[in-house]
Amino acid sequence: MTKDILILAVETSCDETSVSVIKNGRDILSNTVLSQIESHKRFGGVVPEVASRHHVEGITTTINEALVDADVSMEDIDAIAVTEGPGLIGALLIGVNAAKALAFAYDKPLIPVHHIAGHIYANHIEEPLTFPLIALIVSGGHTELVYMKDHLTFEVIGETRDDAVGEAYDKVARTIGLNYPGGPQVDRLAAEGEDTYSFPRVWLDKDSYDFSFSGLKSAVINQLHNQRQKNIPIIEANVATSFQNSVVEVLTFKAIQACKEYGVQRLIVAGGVASNKGLRQSLADQCKVNDIQLTIPSPKLCTDNAAMIGVAGHYLYQQGRFADLALNGHSNIDLEEYSAE
């Protein structure tokens, strides 16, 4: 009988302290998430120093809760997986040092995990990954298209040249007057409005899978500034709808085109913006038309969580990709360099 593999995973790359226990690469035995949204809301965004302090305060309790919820002890754990980057360096160091302490104290292998690899593997929890596939990464810090021909092989075929899509959402939300976090509020507001503005769709070079959202963001900001200067009423829902349609159209088109060019019949979506209802519907419609299998995690698995780190960690464990106690956090790590090849 094959022994179950239990991975204890730690995620502290931004403003969630999360610890999870994953069995055999798919089964979530626990997934404890300590959110800091209320602490950062008054600042209109994540404050790195505040995030780090909250991680320090919560990491030990979160580890203990995850073990209790999973009904396991550290002796049952086979390895410790931890996000080493990218992310806020102060926040990352809390999780990395906690994971190193556990690995040392209990003599367990230590597995460094790329944060974006974790988001990709969140899809595997609900529907096993099949290859080849295209992954659309949409989050506050990243917007990428990634081709994968097997587990842990990452070829970045497109990425943002300026703002990440989630960053653009938050800045537009602030301009409209919405509270942090702005992305979900723009999405909700977009469902109520009409596409009355001619905001740009930025396609860049012909056949390019890169993205650019700074021009769109600036167009929205300038439009609202001009209307306020002239005392022209602003219909916030229409701004949200027009902005979101511009974003979603470009993301959907490039993701579908990538699937066609690479001969792929599987598209997965990863990152916090993957919970956006407008994007989910657009991708679902176009994937149906083009006979492409679409997988998007449940909203609770789109945001930062340790379960996704544990799933990616399971496959790294199988490949024997361990780190020693000199492991450090890194604010930037290239996904392709992290690839198995």
UniProtKB/Swiss-Prot annotation:
Q: Which domain of life is it from?
A: Bacteria
Q: What is this protein called?
A: tRNA N6-adenosine threonylcarbamoyltransferase
Q: Biological process (GO) annotations?
A: tRNA threonylcarbamoyladenosine modification
Which residues are Fe cation-binding? H115, H119, D304
> InterPro entries this protein is in?
ATPase_NBD, Gcp-like_dom, KAE1/TsaD, Peptidase_M22_CS, TsaD
- Enumerate the UniProt keywords alphabetically: Acyltransferase, Cytoplasm, Iron, Metal-binding, Transferase, tRNA processing
- This protein's gene is called tsaD
Task: Name the residues that span the membrane.
Answer: none
Pfam families (alphabetical): TsaD
Q: Which organism is this entry from?
A: Staphylococcus aureus (strain MRSA252)
What does the function comment of this entry state?
Answer: Required for the formation of a threonylcarbamoyl group on adenosine at position 37 (t(6)A37) in tRNAs that read codons beginning with adenine. Is involved in the transfer of the threonylcarbamoyl moiety of threonylcarbamoyl-AMP (TC-AMP) to the N6 group of A37, together with TsaE and TsaB. TsaD likely plays a direct catalytic role in this reaction.
Q: Which cofactor does it need?
A: Fe(2+)
Q: Which family does it belong to?
A: Belongs to the KAE1 / TsaD family.
Catalytic activity, reaction form: L-threonylcarbamoyladenylate + adenosine(37) in tRNA = N(6)-L-threonylcarbamoyladenosine(37) in tRNA + AMP + H(+)
**What does the record note about the cofactor?**
Binds 1 Fe(2+) ion per subunit.
